[in-house]
Amino acid sequence: MMRGEFGEASSLSRSPSSPLQTEPHPQSPKFYRNHYVFSGDHSSYNSSSRFCLRSPSDYSLSSYFSNGLCSSEDGSSQFASPPLDGLMTKYNFGGDDLGLCESFDLLNVGEEDKTHHQTQRSSFGNYEANGDGGFRYYSGFGVDQKDHQISNSWNLGMQSCNMNNYSVPVHGKSGVGALFDHQGISSNPNESLPKVSEFQGYVYFMAKDQHGCRFLQWIFEDGSALDALVIFSEVIPHVVELMMDPFGNYLMQKLLDVCNEEQRTQIILMVTSEPGQLIRISLNAYGTRVVQRLVESIKTRKQISLVKSALRPGFLNLIRDLNGNHVIQRCLQCLSTEDNEFIFEDATKFCIDIATHRHGCCVLQKCIAYSSGLQREKLVTEISRNSLFLAQDPYGNYAVQFVLELRDFSAIAAMLAQLKGHYVELSMQKFSSHMVERCLTHCPESRPQIVRELISVPHFDILIQDPYANFVIQAALAVTKGSLHATLVEVIRPHSILRNNPYCKRIFSRNLLKN
């Protein structure tokens, strides 16, 4: 069952090993519809550890969790209210569903309390992207909750935390409808919110929850230094796991932005404590974001050295991975040429493997662009030496084209020597034909040799009708001049009968055949 999803009680089983389950609260209220259950994955390491609410006796209501004060409309929050459908009263809230009990009598709430609409309440509601951490403040909840009537302890086995001290009214809002009204979010920066110290011991669990994670990020922005220190001290043992968590990774990115150099070094020491650990994080869809942010933020020689040493053993895996290649690119962007030496050396060593890979070919071009001097010369020379093979590869041909555009004359000379005598076969292949066109447009010195090879074909009519070679001939007609252009036109004209062929139409256009 997905997180925050409700179903029949018979479809789930309680996991006795879950650290988050609690014994039934002695004063738990009874629900009419006891066949509904709530289950959610809330384990620290084992996804099979679960907590679930299976019966009325298990509902130890919290004044800001179980009574719908912590509710997720899409069911994505692990801290969720009881089922939204069918478990709430209708007479007091104008049809809005919040997941409350059907009858206030079951909660031991008096008549005066039922109609008391001005009681101030706070809730941990759906977070909006406005930096409020997901906390909303409302008046007119409709139920004056009493500490002796409803347990104030968390339903997840957490300690009691009375939220009533932090309630701030939102004027003009009343009823349960305000809880889901985005306009009901308080924007007053002076309002007092719960302190992280009140959640001490549970920051790790909050970091893995969608709304809890956002609240913790808000603390880094507007909370006290003590609160930020509490968060850091509680997440530092779990940084590896949180970096690869769908929600925790955002907290780790924020932490790297706001922490000091000593704390950043602590984080780096944690993620590099085991061989291959930083590589594993970099290959993860969520972890790669945090490692990229880490690379952006490192400043000291110790930090840079630790990161380089941890990444180098997995260089080839990283550069060919959908997620990992972005870490290498971020190193190229953020580190100095000297610090990227290990990247340039390994890129030269594994040049063919990288150039012929979907992701690797892109990173190889970035390596050439960010390198200089001897480092660039080695990379370009390696590509030039293998240009004939690379030109025919779906991805390698891009590396050859990139070198051609650099206008490095020694590299181009070596490349043209490799390609000489193969222009016809290269022109008739899908990938290498692009490279021949690029030679014609960027290397004037290559044009005579290419044209001579093309017109020397015994059956030139086959060449101009080829789905790929016809583009090479068009490019040759467009860039050649003088006697070379005239020679090419003389060879083409006798085949004018083919002018209606779909591949020959542009070749026989008036503009291209002009002398």
Swiss-Prot record:
Organism: Arabidopsis thaliana
BP GO terms, sorted: regulation of translation
Keyword RNA-binding belongs to the record: yes
Predominant cellular place of this UniProt entry's protein: plastid
Keywords: Chloroplast, Cytoplasm, Plastid, Repeat, RNA-binding, Transit peptide, Translation regulation
Region (Disordered): 1-33
GO CC annotations on file: chloroplast; cytoplasm
GO molecular function terms attached to this record: RNA binding
SMART domains: Pumilio (SM00025)
Chain's role: Sequence-specific RNA-binding protein that regulates translation and mRNA stability by binding the 3'-UTR of target mRNAs.
The UniProt record lists the keyword Cytoplasm: yes
Superkingdom assignment: Eukaryota
Record's compositionally biased regions (Low complexity): 10-20
Pfam families assigned: PUF
Database matches in Gene3D superfamilies: Leucine-rich Repeat Variant (1.25.10.10)
Name recorded for this polypeptide: Putative pumilio homolog 8, chloroplastic
Intracellular or extracellular location(s): Plastid, Chloroplast; Cytoplasm
Pumilio repeat residue intervals: 198-233, 234-269, 270-308, 310-345, 346-381, 382-417, 418-456, 457-490
